[in-house]
Amino acid sequence: MKLSEFVKTEYGKSISECTNEELYYALLTLTKKMASGKQHGNSKKKLYYISAEFLIGKLLSNNLINLGIYDEVKEELAQNGKNICEIEEFEKEPSLGNGGLGRLAACFIDSIATLGLNGDGVGLNYHFGLFRQIFENNMQTTVPDPWLTKKSWLTKTDVTYDIKFKGMTVKSRMYDIDVIGYNNTSNKLHLFDIESVDESIVEDGINFNKEDIKKNLTLFLYPDDSDEAGRILRIYQQYFMVSSAAQLILDECVAKGCNLHDLSDYVVIQINDTHPTMVIPELIRLLVERGLEMDEAIEAVTKSCAYTNHTILAEALEKWPIYYLKKAVPQLMPIIEVLDDKVRRKYHNQAVYIIDGEERVHMAHIDIHYSSSVNGVASLHTEILKNNELHHFYEIYPEKFNNKTNGITFRRWLLHCNPQLTELITSLIGDGFKKDATQLEKLLDYKNDEKVLKQILEIKSAKKMELKKALMEKQNVTINENSIFDIQIKRLHEYKRQQLNALYVIHKYLEIKAGKKPSTPITVIFGAKAAPAYIIAQDIIHLILCLQQLINNDPEVSPYLNVVMVENYNVTWAEKLIPACDISEQISLASKEASGTGNMKFMLNGALTLGTEDGANVEIHELVGDDNIYIFGDSSDTVVERYAQGSYHAAKYYNENAAIKEAVDFITGEELKAIGDKDRLERLFNELVSKDWFMTFPDFDEYVKTREQAYADYENREEWVQKMLVNIAKAGYFSSDRTIEEYNRDIWKLED
């Protein structure tokens, strides 16, 4: 049905007579109707992809693209004087995720549907997400980020489950969002909500009574865990998610006539990081309730589950005190104790026990022992898991460990966010790359085509102008569209080293003040949220915002250097920032970033990577070659060795390296103290000089040198655009379609 016909039926008027808001809701309704007519994957075995977060972004344009009607709708609107981008402004971005974990899950469910596989996502329906970030007095403040409206992509279902906690039973309700594949099937994202949730209990900022479980359970993603009540709330949340998921899985199996002894013939559960780990003991418990012997239930669940590890950071591998579990979900402890006892009888190595000597349950250990597959998300990450972090487990289960390098959906990160580049590529090599991204390699035939290279530069300039306009409209910030756009966008964490970028900004500021001006102006853009309980991360944001105020208001410096931090960074911002970027900052401490996917999105849109040999940067480097990437810093082996020997002392670098000392001293100097918070700046200074746990200082000199080389190379626009083209052409490997094909081939084994 054409939009004009639908609008006539819905509102009794023409497109030109409708408001943009009416048109948005008409398109939403029409899209949902079309999705409901699409076939769902229907193989005997079904995948359940369980994740605490799904950072899906706005859905309207992406769904129209995947339905194959975007151009038609855009044209029909334009003929009636309407702009689809303005209509899209009425859509609220779903607050269902935060960082790379959630964005990966969103890309994966898109690819699962596109490949026609029988698989649904399962998560929670957060009302306020992580939080909405607001900058006040050069500091991050947090407020709820509501997104639910009466008409939305959510569809309320009749599916409800009783979830039993200690001393109370609550009811979960399932809501569905259609996951529309590109010209293929439509699957579901199942989001569970608690029936008794009460948004009114949120008071100042994002504060609420953490012990009022019936009212607070699905309000926020990752509630503040700086106190015991917050940590126990996370257990309630996780169990609520997995118990709902487990009951759904068993109900759907029984409806298909499945013999529960043969669960793995019908079900595969992908556990995305450790947040859904409790699905393993919960499924075992439910199977025993339904008549299976304990050993049978354990075997059935182990064969059905697969675990993806996303981190080597010890703090992110969840370990819950037994006391917490007994307080919230005591029914799981007998199962967990059986699982631990089996491990202890078989392996006499405390490093692999589920329950440690401090009476804590290691969630990742449950996943590894009682799943059939354990995968890392980039080749380097998987090798580090096998040889270092999870080496004891690798010795026991070498056959379980495998690598699945992450990927991104090109439908959103090229077709949707960069239609101009998509159109150019299509005109050169056809549209086969939209379903087979490796076809992008055909672009290499145009590496010396001056006309094509000129068009690529023109598209980049146009995307810079779009970003300039967005920053002016949203934040009243002016940037120079003719400057180098140097961008770092990712959640704020010390290992991602936004502090290293900030130290470079200080270094550059001082150079300009001393009279050394860059050939081309530079705009350094940050986007990041810091967890409310992560004080140093908030201090780093404070430093960046102080630098923004200082530099942008300095008439000597601002013509040559600007700093911008986008407020409330999310998918919508990423879709504007990534196509406009020249230099992609991927500067995590080597060995600490599992993969990263921002690096892939930037590469696909023609940005050049400035990064360490970490995560997927390693594979980008291998694909594009030394001449088309900027690599610096210590190797992962050097970093791991330094940690093992305890041989790194930040103060030594600070005292012996004049450039480091000058930049770090500036943090507590008079210029920043005049506009910043003295305590925050001094705390960050002390953290760097006394600890610098993520080794900013050892990489500083080489980082400065490599970044300056990238800026120098930018001056040769002919060679620079050739590097851009190589990056775009080589990005095809990082399609999430390829990643999902590998998961299915090696782990899930879903039939066509």
Could you describe each region identified by the protein language model?
Residues 1-752:
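A conserved ligand/cofactor-binding region detector
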